[in-house]
């Protein structure tokens, strides 16, 4: 799998429609969705990771593909968890693998939905900070943190898209 460079919002933009945002971790995947106008991101769910890197698609991929169908999304935005210096670690490979699997499954279903990758450095930290400000601890809010990080990823994409 080649190294993926983050995409730029607005390039090959599919136009109006919902977008799905994913914060891919090794244990969970946070999921967010935009409104139909592509302006506001909201949390949807946290999906437990079941797919092994070299194994067949698991229930996590099934769930995300189903959400893409349910919301009739026009793009899927996957966060690339790069290191602070911009280099790619093993977590980037996990995100790429999830994006590849979702794209393959959607194509198999006859749906052409682009997978976009966005630099997500610091989104989890921002999500934790926002939840802390709301009085939710890290321990009690792990799955909420993943959703909040997915919202940060997607909202950043949507905001940059609006500026173009």
Swiss-Prot record:
NCBIfam families: RNAse_H_YqgF (TIGR00250). Its EC number is 3.1.-.-. This is Putative pre-16S rRNA nuclease. Keywords: Cytoplasm, Hydrolase, Nuclease, Ribosome biogenesis. Pfam families: RuvX (PF03652). InterPro entries: RNaseH-like_sf (IPR012337), YqgF (IPR005227), YqgF/RNaseH-like_dom (IPR006641), YqgF/RNaseH-like_dom_sf (IPR037027). Could be a nuclease involved in processing of the 5'-end of pre-16S rRNA. PANTHER family: POLYNUCLEOTIDYL TRANSFERASE, RIBONUCLEASE H-LIKE SUPERFAMILY PROTEIN. It comes from Corynebacterium kroppenstedtii (strain DSM 44385 / JCM 11950 / CIP 105744 / CCUG 35717). Belongs to the YqgF nuclease family. HAMAP family: Nuclease_YqgF (MF_00651). It is found in: Cytoplasm. It comes from the Bacteria. GO terms for molecular function: nuclease activity. GO terms for cellular component: cytosol. It is an enzyme of class 3 (hydrolase). One of its GO terms (biological process) is rRNA 5'-end processing.
């Amino acid at each position: 799998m080649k190294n993926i460079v983050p995409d730029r919002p607005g390039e090959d933009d599919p136009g109006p429609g919902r977008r799905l945002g994913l914060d891919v971790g090794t244990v969970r995947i946070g999921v967010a969705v935009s409104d139909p106008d592509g302006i506001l991101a909201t949390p949807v769910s946290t999906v437990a990771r079941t797919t092994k890197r070299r194994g067949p698609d698991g229930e996590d991929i099934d769930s995300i593909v189903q959400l893409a169908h349910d919301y009739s999304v026009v793009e899927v935005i996957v966060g690339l968890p790069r290191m602070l210096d911009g280099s790619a670690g093993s977590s980037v490979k996990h995100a790429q693998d999830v994006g590849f699997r979702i794209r393959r499954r959607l194509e198999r279903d006859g749906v052409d939905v682009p997978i976009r990758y966005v630099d997500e450095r610091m989104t989890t930290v921002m999500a934790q900070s926002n939840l802390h400000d709301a009085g939710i601890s890290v321990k009690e809010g792990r799955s909420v943190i993943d959703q909040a990080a997915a919202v940060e990823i997607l909202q950043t994409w949507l905001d940059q898209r609006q500026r173009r």
